[in-house]
């Protein structure tokens, strides 16, 4: 019974499926009861076949695609296509609705086309039906081969990788439709390099050998070919892959030599490169972890070997100073290894490599060596000793030359000490610890040859001399005290509390004792036994008229050995006070007036400067008076100052010619004969006067006397203006007798004056001759 029910249900489902398409194909229809009328309006629909076309279709164009058909039956019906490709790629027969393709189609360029179908009236061009959109799909054919995304690939993989290590993922693309079976599937195949690599899966390259050694072959080139499932391949279906092997630390260092020999001087600096130990390690620098060590010999603390991965070498450096006199040769065995290497990469290779190193030390003339790095001596102050301490330096070389000692005078402290040829230090003056408690000396040791001459090799050492204290300073006040007391102070009034210090080294148990040097009538000193003392009023009530300041000599003693006692004076000022005991009037003790040496020196220099200035003024005035006494005025003397670039002849420049001759010629006089030089020296040129009894002279006696009188008056006229005084004339010009006094406005020139006689006066007057003489070249210009 249950089986029958299940069969009936299945039959009902099947009938429902059969009736569903009918309903779907007529969406405009509605089921109505049989009682309703059967007359209703039916909608017109487009009718055409499914539009599909193969790409790259063979045959002559055009190619039939399909038919569009409308349910409208009208004799004037016309079909049209609209769209981007309508009229170019696709056309429709306006009468039948057949659609044709007029070009070969490529699905990889355009997989489908969207068009719009129209049905219009031929006469009116009006739409008889609503436009309908439809699609023409291009069917794919297997007309494309796989193409790599790039022609060259670069990849890397560590050397000595295990088989199956991924290297790179290649990608090739087939432009065909992937939904069509086997059209877009890609098959990869190695064309070159299959002995070291392989392809697994879709383009994954893996290692196929475990012996990929970068030091043997650093790079591999493989060629990969692609094709689709149907075996279609082309020129673009291959790609080249360059695979670089990455270096790993898989090689041990090996010495390039089994024996290394070096020769170095004994004065090589500690830490300086001594030599290089080259090793062979084909790994790259970042994987060279060479470790050098000394395996045989007792010199592990004498030398060190620092690796240099870049140059693939180990650098030997001394850790201690070398001494030829002690060891002339070092011989030891070294080992090179790499502790970071992966032992899985080794194949029977030794993990260690050894070599022999021999270092020969050569002798160098070294400076003297002091036995100690520094010296410390002690000396009591106020003591002069012929020997404080000794320094000792020796020649480390085999020659064992003698040594000379000296103290560098780097400061004034060095003048207190001396050193003899044996290195014994002594003081030449007594020392005061309170001035300098320490003396730091620099002692030089110089190597001397057989004649006692320094060879240039020297060394220095620091010597520290400590001055020990002696009780040679008496105690004194700790500070200056300004004690004051009221004139009506009562008995027992505390005036001031005093304390003491000692410039000597003060021990913890130092004790100072205080006492008055003389008994005072009105002050009392009380020792507190704690290195302080109180000064109090003894009777009270002071008289300011009798004494405004009281001077108390106080004795202060220490407990040193020997005990010293010092005297310090305390000055107590008596002041007027108010009722509250406040000081209202005090006369402080004036400081002693004195003049220091510096002030005296300054005063003396000022007095000396004033005296020198006064003397210079006096000498200048005296020289001016002497010049006037010679009978020459200042303007005449000034006229004889001739400036030129040639060397002068001293007094001969003033005695060899007469300035008055030049003046007479400049004022239009005739050319005079050259005067004879006077044999005796003269300060001024002698004026060549005409003889007293020359023919044509009028009244020679009277005229000569008058000229002499006028000349003396002019020479001794102290009230006359100086020669460089500016003369101001009230009127000047054409209406004046003198007209213009300026040389710029005159029409006359000195061209008619003959100065050729200057050429006869010698080379000293060459400059004047060139300035005033005629130039023969000027005559050629006219």
Swiss-Prot record:
GO cellular component terms given for this protein: adherens junction; bicellular tight junction; catenin complex; cell junction; cell-cell junction; cytoplasm
Residues annotated as binding Ca(2+) 3: 142, 144, 174, 176, 183, 228
Proregion positions: 23-44
Superkingdom of this protein's organism: Eukaryota
Alphabetical GO biological process terms: adherens junction organization; calcium-dependent cell-cell adhesion via plasma membrane cell adhesion molecules; cell migration; cell morphogenesis; cell-cell adhesion mediated by cadherin; cell-cell junction assembly; endothelial cell morphogenesis; homophilic cell adhesion via plasma membrane adhesion molecules
Domain notes: Three calcium ions are usually bound at the interface of each cadherin domain and rigidify the connections, imparting a strong curvature to the full-length ectodomain.
Name listed for the protein in its UniProt record: Cadherin-5
Organism of provenance: Sus scrofa
Gene this chain is encoded by: CDH5
């Amino acid at each position: 019974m249950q089986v029958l029910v299940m069969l009936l249900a299945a039959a009902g489902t099947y009938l429902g499926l059969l009736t569903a398409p009918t309903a779907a194909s007529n969406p405009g229809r509605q089921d109505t009861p049989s009682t309703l009328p059967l007359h209703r309006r039916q909608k017109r629909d487009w009718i055409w076949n499914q539009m599909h076309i193969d790409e790259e279709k063979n045959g002559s164009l055009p190619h039939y695609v399909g038919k569009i058909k409308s349910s409208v039956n009208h004799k004037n019906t016309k079909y049209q296509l609209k769209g981007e490709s309508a009229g170019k790629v696709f056309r429709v027969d306006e009468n039948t609705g057949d659609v044709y393709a007029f070009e070969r189609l490529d699905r990889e360029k355009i997989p489908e086309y969207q068009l719009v179908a129209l049905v219009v009236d031929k006469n009116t061009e009006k739409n008889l039906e609503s436009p309908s959109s439809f699609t023409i799909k291009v069917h794919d054919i297997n007309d494309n081969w796989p193409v790599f995304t790039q022609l060259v690939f670069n990849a890397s993989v560590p050397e000595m990788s295990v088989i199956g290590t991924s290297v790179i993922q290649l990608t090739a693309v087939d432009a065909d439709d992937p939904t069509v079976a086997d059209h877009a599937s890609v098959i990869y195949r190695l064309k070159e390099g299959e002995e070291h690599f392989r392809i697994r899966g879709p383009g994954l390259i893996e290692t196929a050998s475990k012996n990929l050694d970068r030091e043997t072959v650093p790079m591999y080139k493989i060629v990969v070919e692609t094709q689709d499932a149907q075996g279609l391949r082309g020129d673009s279906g291959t790609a080249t892959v360059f695979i670089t092997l990455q270096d790993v630390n898989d090689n041990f260092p090996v010495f390039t030599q089994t024996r290394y020999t070096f020769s170095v001087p004994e004065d090589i600096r500690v830490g300086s490169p001594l030599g290089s130990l080259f090793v062979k390690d084909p790994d790259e620098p970042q994987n060279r972890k060479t470790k050098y060590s000394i395996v045989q010999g007792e010199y592990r603390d004498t030398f060190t070997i620092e690796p240099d991965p870049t140059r693939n070498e180990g650098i030997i450096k001394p850790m201690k100073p070398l001494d030829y006199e002690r060891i002339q040769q070092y011989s030891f065995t070294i080992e090179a290894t790499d502790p970071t290497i992966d032992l899985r990469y080794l194949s029977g290779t030794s993990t260690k490599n050894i070599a022999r190193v021999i270092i020969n030390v050569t002798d160098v003339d070294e400076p003297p060596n002091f036995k100690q790095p520094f010296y410390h001596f002690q000396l009591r102050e106020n003591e002069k000793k012929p020997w404080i301490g000794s320094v000792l330096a020796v020649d480390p070389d085999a020659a064992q030359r003698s040594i000379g000692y000296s103290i560098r005078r780097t400061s004034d402290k060095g003048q207190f000490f001396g050193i003899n040829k044996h290195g014994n230090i002594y003081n030449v003056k007594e020392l005061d610890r309170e001035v300098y408690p320490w003396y730091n000396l620099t002692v030089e040791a110089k190597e001397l040859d057989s004649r006692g001459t320094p060879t240039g090799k020297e060394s220095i050492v620091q010597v520290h001399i400590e001055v020990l204290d002696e009780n040679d300073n008496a105690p004194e006040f700790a500070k200056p005290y300004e004690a004051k007391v009221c004139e009506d102070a009562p008995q027992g009034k505390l005036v001031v509390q005093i304390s003491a210090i000692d410039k000597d080294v003060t021990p913890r148990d130092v004790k100072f004792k205080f006492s008055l040097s003389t008994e005072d009538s009105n002050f009392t000193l009380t020792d507190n036994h704690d290195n302080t003392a109180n000064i109090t009023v003894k009777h009270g009530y002071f008289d300011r008229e009798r004494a405004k300041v009281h001077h108390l000599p106080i004795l202060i003693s220490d407990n040193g050995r020997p005990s010293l006692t010092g005297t310090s004076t305390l000055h107590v000022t008596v002041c007027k006070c108010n009722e509250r005991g406040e000081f209202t009037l005090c006369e402080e003790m004036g400081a002693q007036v004195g003049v220091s040496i510096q002030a005296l020196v300054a005063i003396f220099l000022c007095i000396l400067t004033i005296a020198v200035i006064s003397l210079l003024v006096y000498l200048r005035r005296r020289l001016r008076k002497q010049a006037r006494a010679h009978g020459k005025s200042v303007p005449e003397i000034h006229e004889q100052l001739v400036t030129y670039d040639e060397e002068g002849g001293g007094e001969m420049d003033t005695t060899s010619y007469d300035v008055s001759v030049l003046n007479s010629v400049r004022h239009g006089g005739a050319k005079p004969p050259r005067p004879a030089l006077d044999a005796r020296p003269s300060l001024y040129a002698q004026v060549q006067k005409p003889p007293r009894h020359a023919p044509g002279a009028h009244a020679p006696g009277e005229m000569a006397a008058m000229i002499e009188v006028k000349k003396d008056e002019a020479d001794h006229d102290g009230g006359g203006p100086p020669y460089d005084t500016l003369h101001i004339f009230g009127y000047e010009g054409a209406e004046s007798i003198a007209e213009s006094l300026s040389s710029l406005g005159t029409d006359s020139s000195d061209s008619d004056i003959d100065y050729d006689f200057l050429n006869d006066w010698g080379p000293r007057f060459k400059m004047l001759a060139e300035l005033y003489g005629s130039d023969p070249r000027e005559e050629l210009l006219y």
